[in-house]
Amino acid sequence: MDDPTRIDPTLESLRRAWEGQPNLSLPTFFAMLANQGIGWGATDAELVAELERQAGVHPPLLPLEGGRIAAGEWLVLADAPTYRITATPTHIIVRRPDTQPVVWAYESIRPTGPGRPFTIRDTEGFEHRFGVVSSLMRLS
């Protein structure tokens, strides 16, 4: 018999990975896993490794340390209104339809993820609200 204590950590890995892509139905998410070779013959360890990889690309929360991007560059898609925002450890690049991109330094980002509001405080202390996050994706 397999160790039943493996179930909770496996389900937690599934939760984190799926929360990073909440627009997908669970069957669609499982189909994506199948495209990566995770099917009937996969081990729990292989499943957890793929779920962790998925959560690394599309995390449930933007990885922050002290209100700033912890590492890498991230694409944040936000709706209502539509924004494409690139966040780095030091700068924000905001792109909207039919406008020029804007780049500025920031002080902090509030904790955010899909389905949550996206708010950034600039270096002058002003808070900028960018709607609701629909997707996070690691760029580098």
Regions found by a protein language model. Give the residues of each.
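Amphipathic alpha-helical segments that form the core helices of the histone-fold
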Residues: R15, F29-A42
